[in-house]
Each structure stands twice: as C-alpha cells, then as structure tokens.
C-alpha cells in the first residue's frame, strides 16, 4: 500500500491520474464529459473552491499595488507576430479565429497576453511618473494542446489563468518586482498547503521572449512533477518590439523593462493531489467551501436533536464559520460521513440525543479522523483551534513528503535509477547548455533548472555528463506533466 503525507493510505495513487479523475468527478468538483478535447466543466462545488482561491490571489495582488484589468480574448495577429521568439514559442499552440464571411483580419485566441498588453502600455505610459505599472487579470487562455489532455492539469482552455504584467523604469526595479512576485506565489502556495520547489529554468526551457524564467514545481503522488507557477523577467525584449518608451527624469526617452507571471487551476489540482487520500479530498480549512458539516443523528420524529444542531450551526455562522447542516432524512449518518469526507470538509460536527442531554457536540478531524467531545459553550473556539491545527498539520506533512522525494546523485546512471522511482533528482552541472541537454538525454528526464530555494552548490564535483567540466550548479531533474 502506498502512503502519502500524514501516513494516510493511498493505494489508488499507484495510478494517480485514475485516482485524480475519479475523486474530482465523485466529489462534484469537475466534469470532464464535455465533448471537446481539453475543455471541461466546473461544477458548483468546484466553482466555490475556485472562488475562494481566486479571492486569495486577488487579495495578495491588490495588497502589493497591482490593479485588476480585463482584456479582450482576441489578439490581432499583427501584435502577436511582432516578437519573433515569442511567436516561435507559441505559434504551434494557438487557436486561430476565422470570420464566417471570409474576411482578411486574422485573430488569435490569447495563449497569454504579453502581446495584447504592450500596445496598451504604449498608450498608458508617458513618463517616469507612470511607472511602475502593475496590472493583472484572471481569464481564460487557449492552447492547442497536441499532447494527451488531463482534467485540470493539461487543458486547451485554461479557464483560471491569473496573469500579471508589470512595467518598470530599469532592470533593478523590474527584478525587485520578480522577487516580489516570487514572494506572492510563496504565500499562495503556503496558504493552500502546497509544497514547492523554486528553480531558474534552463535557457532552453525559459518562456518565449523572456530573459529568464523562475518556476514553481510540486511533486505529484506518482513521482512526476507539475509546474504550478512561473515568473518571467522580460527585459526590454517586448518594449523594443512595440516601441514602448517613457520620458525619464534625465529628460531622455528610455525603453521600459517588463515582467510577467502566471498561475492557473493547476494550483487547485495540486492542492487536491498532494493532500487527498483514498477517502477523497482534504481541503485547507480557510479555502474549503464548507468548513464544518453538522450531522444531526435523529431517531423517529423527535425534533430536539435537529433544533439543537441548527442552534449550534447558527452560533458558528455568527462567528464567521462556513457551516452546513445535513438534515436529510433519506440518508443514514454513515452515508453522510462518507459523502462529506469525499468532499474534503475539514471538520464534522455530530449531534445525537446524548449530546443534547450533555449540552455538548462531537468534532471529527478530516485529516486524522480524531474525535473530540466539546462543550457547546466552547464550540466556536474549539472549531477555530481545530481548523488551525488541521492546516498546520497539512502543511507540515506535505512539506515533509516533498523533501523526502528530492535526492542527489553525482552520476547519470544512478540519477536515472532514482528518477525511475519518482521524485526529483539533483545532479552536478557546469551550466553548459549542451551538457545539460546531454544529462536530460542520458537520464530520460526533464530539467527543472537551478535551485533558487537553497544556496548550496556542488563542491569539487564534475558535470554529470561532461566530466571534463567543473560543476557550478545543481541541476534539478524530473519526469513531468
């Protein structure tokens, strides 16, 4: 039996995609039966989860001076084709819009919005007082994926794409923004109990048109990694193409420096994947649509238990807790336990005749299934304490699990064997692109890049594929989605 964070059984995780597809369908998060490849439906419970996550994203961007915008889904081909490296990176993935009348205008469904934003930045930015400019939007983007699509993981319509775009007077200020963006993403992942690795992508895998790319990756239960966020320093690459300049304090015209950074519904997929178990979802309490489900255990026509349960529910609602009373008469308590465990509700509150008599309730944690008898007068404080304990335990256990799946090796044959077991392997690398590609070829893996979440460097080691070269960095390798 496979065990994941917190030692919870994960026998189904031997086939992760099968488990994932089943749980998001059974928990009524997502429906992937829509008859268009790579396009899926968020069901009401999934939308509720998504809205809570989007609120977190908006809060952290708003707090750091970003302003929300909403751009059209169409990008004129004239704009899209201006940056040659960018179009080379995306042209094979774009959807083209053709007019029914056969008109000449060529439009692209946005795959990302750098080329849509820059012409507007040119209109909005006049002098140094207009900088920095920081905007973001949460929208659909479209990629003509030719690989196998997976619900919430590899899509043709990415329907929850948060992209931020910023403009700055110089490289120093733009790179300060890159650091701030990394900090924002750290906070998002931490609050969603998603462990992560931060790496600088190798040049051959950076964003099309970027000077460099920083990426967040997490490890899925099957040992593959998934990219869950990226931050790009774009330098003057786009501003020169679109001729976006500002009047500086020195009275001279200068090109702006830009950044962009994005995350998508993959963060929800990761939150589900790294925390769930054989019973279903386990949601971080602050972002669960329902934080406490109340199960009245009733006998006959006696209404006292139900009235008591609704009274406790009202107290929790007044305290700001998202609570639901499951008072259905056609379902047994056992069925309800299973149902709400599947949906990942963090706390179950049970009320039976003895609880009414004792003026108490019974609380059960979704993460450990420990039970607690609590006096009614203490129920609000107990729920708050339990939600914090659950979140702390989720974060601690998922980080421990991720760290246990990152290993090091100084030679490619051992690295390949470790990669076959799953997880991330770090090998010594000179920094030479050709040697890096050779490492990937020999280990049959993908290069995530150079670790940015540790200052350690190889000591007296040679490049894993080019022994004549001294290693300067660790290179992270994995098999990835």
UniProtKB/Swiss-Prot annotation:
It is found in: Cytoplasm. One of its GO terms (biological process) is prolyl-tRNA aminoacylation. Transmembrane segments: none annotated. Disulfide bonds: none annotated. Pfam families: HGTP_anticodon (PF03129), ProRS-C_1 (PF09180), tRNA-synt_2b (PF00587). GO terms for cellular component: aminoacyl-tRNA synthetase multienzyme complex; cytoplasm. Its EC number is 6.1.1.15. It comes from the Archaea. PANTHER family: BIFUNCTIONAL GLUTAMATE_PROLINE--TRNA LIGASE (PTHR43382:SF2), PROLYL-TRNA SYNTHETASE (PTHR43382). This is Proline--tRNA ligase. It comes from Caldivirga maquilingensis (strain ATCC 700844 / DSM 13496 / JCM 10307 / IC-167). The gene is proS.
